[in-house]
Structure formats: C-alpha cells, structure tokens
C-alpha cells in the first residue's frame, strides 16, 4: 500500500506491505501499530567519509520513534528479506527514546560498535529490519549510490544526505531539479544492444 501521500509513488520507500492478508481492494487501507524503531540512514559506498577503527565500512542507522527505550535483543537486519536473521542484534542492546543506533556493515569485530557481518551493494540493494517475532518492521530498496553520501529518511521519503551516524540526518546540497535535462536516448537499439536514456545536469 502507498503510505506517504506527499511522497513519490515511484519510490519503493513510500510503499509497504498491507497489514491484512490480501489487502483491502476498493476499501480504505487498514492501519496497523506504529513501529517502535525504523531505518533512518544508510551509507552504502563509504570511501572516505566515516571511519570506524582502521577502515571505512558502510552502515545502517536505526532510530527509536517510540518515545521510550526499546530493547533490541532478537531484532534482526538483513539484505535479503527472505532470510530475515542474517544479523541478530545481541542481548543488552538498548536504543534510547528518540535515539539512534549505528550498525556497521562489515565483520571487523575488533572495531567499536555492532558489526552485521554483511555488506550492501552500492549499485543497488535492499535492507530490511525485523522484530523478534520475525515480522518485517521496515524496508528500503535503493538504487546506485553516490560515494561518501548517505541516504536518509525525511518527511518526503528518502533523500541524499551527508553521513551523520548516531545523529539527526543532514540533507546534502543538491542542484535545482529544474537544471536536469533529458539529453539523449536510444529507443531502437541494434540487435543485442539496450535502449538507454541520458540525463544532463546543467548546474
């Protein structure tokens, strides 16, 4: 179901599974319980932006929107929604009310923090958050990423950010969309070739 009336209907971030099996065709969408914790920021191509230990790993940031502390034991994170238990958050991890939790996407357990043991594809991937019952709480599918820039949740969906693990999101400076032009395309490629579209940034 489409859940963000101000968002882009072409963005997967603005859609979620229905709360009722089979959906509600021809009727208003069912509302469900508000999530306690959400995906808030993702950095999938960390070249030099943020270090953790001696390396620059990718990360996922969670945000507590419940207004009270949430114990995250047996919550899980995965880049494959069919395998929700790729990384189980260990016992004793608490995310404070209105707080943030950074999970590093590597296996360097000598470095500070939590480490998921898997990485994301900077050409596009999916990341999903599951509660202890194995129910999907939040998910985002994203495309090709910009080096050293994260994507962060905003009131209008997900936008390009400056990486801020453990802190409030900070939008990155971007050009006016009016400066973007359709510059060239091929609609009838030769045999074995692909059609394509080229965009040009005039800014």
Model-identified regions with their sequence ranges:
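Intrinsically disordered, low-complexity linkers and terminal tails enriched in Ser/Thr/Pro/Gly
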Residues: 1-203
């Amino acid at each position: 179901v489409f859940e963000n009336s101000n968002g882009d209907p072409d963005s997967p971030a603005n859609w979620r599974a229905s709360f009722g099996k089979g959906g509600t065709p021809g009727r208003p969408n069912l509302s469900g319980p508000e999530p306690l914790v959400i995906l808030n920021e993702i950095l999938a191509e960390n070249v030099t932006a943020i270090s953790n230990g001696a390396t620059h790993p990718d990360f996922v940031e969670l945000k507590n929107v419940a207004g009270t502390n949430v114990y995250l034991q047996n919550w899980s994170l995965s880049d494959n929604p069919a395998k929700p238990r790729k990384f189980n958050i260990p016992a004793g991890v608490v995310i404070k009310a209105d707080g943030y939790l950074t999970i590093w996407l590597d296996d360097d357990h000598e470095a500070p923090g939590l480490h998921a043991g898997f990485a994301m594809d900077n050409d596009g991937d999916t990341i999903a958050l599951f509660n202890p019952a194995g129910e999907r709480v939040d998910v985002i599918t994203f495309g090709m990423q910009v080096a050293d820039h994260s994507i962060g949740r905003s009131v209008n969906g997900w936008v390009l950010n400056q990486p801020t693990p453990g802190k409030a999101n900070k939008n990155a400076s971007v050009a006016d969309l009016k400066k973007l032009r359709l510059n060239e395309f091929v609609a009838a490629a030769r045999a074995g070739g692909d059609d394509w579209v080229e965009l040009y940034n005039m800014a």
